[in-house]
Amino acid sequence: MLLTTGRKEKLSVSKGSEIEISSQEYEYGSGNVWYCVILEENLAKSKRKKLSVRHLDPLLKYDYSPPLIKTTVHRFMRPVPPPDPFPEVDFEEGDVVDAAYKGGWCSGSVVKVLGNRRFLVYLRFQPDVIELLRKDLRPHFVWKDEEWFRCEKQQLIESDFSAGKSVEVRTKVDKLGDVWAPAMVIKEDEDGTMLVKLKTLKEEEVNCTKISVSYSEIRPSPLPIGLRDYKLMENVDALVESGWCPGVVSKVLAGKRYAVDLGPNRESKEFSRLQLRPSIEWKDGIWHRKEKVSGSEESSHAVEETAASTRIRITVRTALKEKKALGTGINVRTTRSSSGAMHNPLPASFNGGDVAEAGRVSVTVNETPLFETAALSGELGNSLADVVMNESAPVTSQPEIAAPKEFHPSVVLGVAAAVKTQGKTTPKKKLQAMKNQKSSTNDSVGEKVSVNKRKRGQPRKFIVAEPKQKIGVSGNNSKAATIEHADMTDDDRPLASWVHTGNSSSGQSVSRTPDIGLNTVVEKHVDIVETPPGRESTMVLPFVKKSQLWKVLESMEVFKVVPQSPHFSPLLESEEECREGDAIGRMVMFSSLLEKVNNLQVDDPISSINRIDECFLKLEKHGFNVTTPRSRIAKILSIKERQTCALEELKAVEEKITENDNKRRKYEEDIVELQRQEVLMKEAKVTLDNEIARMQSQAAVLDQEVQNVDHEFQAILAAPWK
């Protein structure tokens, strides 16, 4: 639809006039190309049908070389359109414009505003989409019946494949197969295909190829993503010379570089992170991400560990001297199946209870609680046997209370057995004494031991039979291996009595049971279970657990999920009657703090989170393991700091948006005011034109009267005297 401008203009066809001509006859409002020319001859004097013209550059107004047009006919001419009334105002999407392109003014429409006074323009003549600056554009005017009209703004239809949209086209490349090349949509052809223009990836190449493709060979451009790391066997698209080629990451190299297998031939090439993106598929109008490569290809890169059956050979020998009965030498031989485990037996020899040399095992019996145990039954009866993990270092005794051991899963399996001895025992009685140990009431270390039978194919396990035991490891890293025993009566004694009287409540020697000696070799298949690190069953506390609340606390889900073994040593400074109550309060406090952490909200103040962290610090002094909750609190505080910064930036951006919006509204008001003034000025101009025309007519009459008077005057002077 055409909109009138109220301006009329006649075509001047005299020599030297600047006009615009078309290369073909045009229809009003249709797309065409108009060239700026200078007439080289007058239309009235020329007896030829065609007129000679001189082609001008559409912007610079000098001769265009080489000229694209030299002659024209009258019906292809029109005056030069009126100048742009608002050259400082940017065009909007859908505006019909003329673009200075290839020596002429090509009509088209704006399909996208790029910013910084840059626009994507769809050209109707020789269909194309090009990027142009504001200075290379002008409003599209139509000259009809000696009057200028403007075209109404077009309504653009937005879609994934509308003109000017960035897309990717599937092309075939030798050795690489399918490659997705970047392109831009121009228009939809009548046969249902899409006319697109391939984008070049080389800066030196300017001309872009136009091709028609079907909808199955085209897809929108994926959204850009930030820099990220890629994993082994991950599906990616790699940027090659002709586009994005699908591939699989085969190697992760140093310096954020990757080796990628491309195409059906699996050609391997190296790429940086900037040249890769996750591989995604356009299907049914939705992006689908390809899954990681699995199967035989991935299994070659994975490492899988399987448990092997273990055969343990144990040799137990008694001490020869009564005064050194605290140590018992044990020879341990560990063998494994063909899974690649060690087959080295530990050399062991023992003399008179002395600590063995490197590779030997010695065991000490103490009256302190134990932390981790595993037991053996059968010919050994109820005698204790602890399985420890060591890397070719000896297991040595440790007096008094031993420090908890660290759990190391990748070490050699060894066995240590704890036996209370007193006096000497002949070798003939060793095995019998071992069998009769079940009925001994004086032996405080009578433990239930069982060896589970397992079905074929099941993993081997160690059965944990008694919680009041502790295993430590001593090797090159000074880790001690200690097996200790505690009487039931000593567990309930306060820590103060231990400090004054020592580890034994009776003040007697540690060794209180009859001497039990063994000098035999027992071979058993034992199932192995790795005891979780940090497992503790009994702790020497500064008070006696008398309240029934302890069972309730220990049965709570929170202490099953996050096991705790606090020592409550700071309570020694409190009154003895208040210690148990204070300890229960701290257990409840730990549970409530974990619940508070779980119930934290994103809008909670940082001060309240810091107070929770300070409470955990106080509980840590009492032996609570607060590493996990404090780590979570640290992450939450970090997120809160980021949230605070983001909120401040958001506030600043919103203020800037409000400020710019106010400016935009002011500009709109100014534009409306200018348009109103334009209408008023046009009306005033029309009034002045009419007034000028009236006055010109009056002036003509007066001029004629003046001429008549002059003629009369001359006639009177020229009249004869006769």
Swiss-Prot record:
<comment type="subunit">
    <text>Homodimer. Interacts wtih ABAP1, ARIA and LHP1. Interacts with the non-modified histones H1, H2B, H3 and H4.</text>
</comment>
<keyword id="KW-0539">Nucleus</keyword>
<feature type="coiled-coil region">
    <location>
        <begin position="645"/>
        <end position="712"/>
    </location>
</feature>
<dbReference type="GO" id="GO:0005634">
    <property type="term" value="C:nucleus"/>
</dbReference>
<dbReference type="Pfam" id="PF05266">
    <property type="entry name" value="DUF724"/>
</dbReference>
<keyword id="KW-0175">Coiled coil</keyword>
<feature type="compositionally biased region" description="Polar residues">
    <location>
        <begin position="434"/>
        <end position="444"/>
    </location>
</feature>
<keyword id="KW-0287">Flowering</keyword>
<keyword id="KW-0341">Growth regulation</keyword>
<dbReference type="InterPro" id="IPR014002">
    <property type="entry name" value="Agenet_dom_plant"/>
</dbReference>
<dbReference type="GO" id="GO:0009908">
    <property type="term" value="P:flower development"/>
</dbReference>
<dbReference type="InterPro" id="IPR008395">
    <property type="entry name" value="Agenet-like_dom"/>
</dbReference>
<protein>
    <recommendedName>
        <fullName>DUF724 domain-containing protein 7</fullName>
    </recommendedName>
</protein>
<feature type="region of interest" description="Disordered">
    <location>
        <begin position="424"/>
        <end position="449"/>
    </location>
</feature>
<feature type="domain" description="DUF724">
    <location>
        <begin position="540"/>
        <end position="720"/>
    </location>
</feature>
<keyword id="KW-0813">Transport</keyword>
<comment type="function">
    <text>May act as a link between DNA replication, transcription and chromatin remodeling during flower development. May participate in the repression of LHP1-targeted genes during flower development by direct interaction with LHP1. May be involved in the polar growth of plant cells via transportation of RNAs.</text>
</comment>
<dbReference type="GO" id="GO:0042803">
    <property type="term" value="F:protein homodimerization activity"/>
</dbReference>
<dbReference type="Pfam" id="PF05641">
    <property type="entry name" value="Agenet"/>
</dbReference>
<dbReference type="InterPro" id="IPR007930">
    <property type="entry name" value="DUF724"/>
</dbReference>
